[in-house]
């Protein structure tokens, strides 16, 4: 028994890498309690300079029974008592979760990890107590969903979290080995009563399926972890092999060439599409969604405006390229009659916060990266509007163009046109931010001028 505990500590130290500042996600359960105790043992026994803190989320899940809140209070009291006894600084963050379109556990997990990310200090990494049983459950759930190698890779030992990292240093330990360690060291922990609820798939696997599998095949957990690691290796290899071509198929704006994809086999094309979407942090689409993306969006007629909704994202086609963006931000045009008056001081930097997550405009007499325009006269009212109409004559063009024709010639996608800020002096259009300056907005030599810059959110 001592040999197992010692081995666990040695492996734990190896899995921590070169980091020495840790924030432990501490729930008071077996996994996080053993993790915290193990860290303290490594620090004290090996005289290591480890900086250890703990964080506990005191959760209130809306639409849950009242006794659940009482359990949460009991867990908080236990965590505070344990950290006080071990002299570990504990940060407690209250969180309230209401599921919207997600299951309550998924919604809570999203909020929880955002809290963890915000709590991390400089050079600090987050540690969670996930173990081999958790990894096996993750792989089995991915198998149930029909996932490919990416999903079957399970949870990585290390992954990015905000500006830092998340480490799972106990992934190579079974829950049974953690329990033996806790019993040997006389460690107390709290069992989460929610873990007995078979309504959740993980609990069903944990309580009914894994015991059968490990009873029949004692090394099933280790074998599953090995398979997950092999799947992860294959995904890493594919990333390396396809990264150069994916880079070649992307424009500077991050759009993806349909013509380039069409030259690939279906298998390679799907792999490239998955990596493109993953690079944009989009939830991985199903095989059917990828097929629809190619047939209904990429191969649609040139005059059509098809799109595929993928969670909160939209994928659209324009001029032989695929575009991706959050639909909550870019799918809805700003009202054409919408107008914002801009208080303006010609001699200083002027800023205006735009509506609907569009960022802000800056206009300054000092040299900047923006468009050069003539300065407004004292009697001119400055405003920002949306929705270009009529004929417009812009710099660099001899003849005026109708707004629709002009947008087409400039290569502006249809869904972006009514979200581009238009700068007016009185009723005169001066510029479309980042796109063009009209002839009436020209900054002539020797006359006052300023610089217009659009800082997007």
UniProtKB/Swiss-Prot annotation:
Subcellular location: Cytoplasm
GO biological process per UniProt: tRNA modification
One GO location term (cellular component): cytoplasm
A Pfam family matched in the record: ATP_bind_3
EC number: 6.3.4.19
Keyword terms of this UniProt record: ATP-binding, Cytoplasm, Ligase, Nucleotide-binding, tRNA processing
Annotated binding of ATP, by residue: 27-32
Presence of the UniProt keyword Cytoplasm in the record: yes
UniProt cross-references to InterPro entries, sorted A to Z: Lysidine-tRNA-synth_C (IPR012796), Rossmann-like_a/b/a_fold (IPR014729), TilS/TtcA_N (IPR011063), tRNA_Ile_lys_synt (IPR012094), tRNA_Ile_lys_synt_N (IPR012795), tRNA_Ile_lys_synt_subst-bd (IPR015262)
Keyword Ligase on entry: yes
Lineage: superkingdom: Bacteria
Reactions that this protein is recorded to catalyse: cytidine(34) in tRNA(Ile2) + L-lysine + ATP = lysidine(34) in tRNA(Ile2) + AMP + diphosphate + H(+)
GO function terms (MF aspect): ATP binding; tRNA(Ile)-lysidine synthase activity
Description of its domains: The N-terminal region contains the highly conserved SGGXDS motif, predicted to be a P-loop motif involved in ATP binding.
Family: Belongs to the tRNA(Ile)-lysidine synthase family.
Protein function: Ligates lysine onto the cytidine present at position 34 of the AUA codon-specific tRNA(Ile) that contains the anticodon CAU, in an ATP-dependent manner. Cytidine is converted to lysidine, thus changing the amino acid specificity of the tRNA from methionine to isoleucine.
Protein name: tRNA(Ile)-lysidine synthase
Encoding gene, per UniProt annotation: tilS
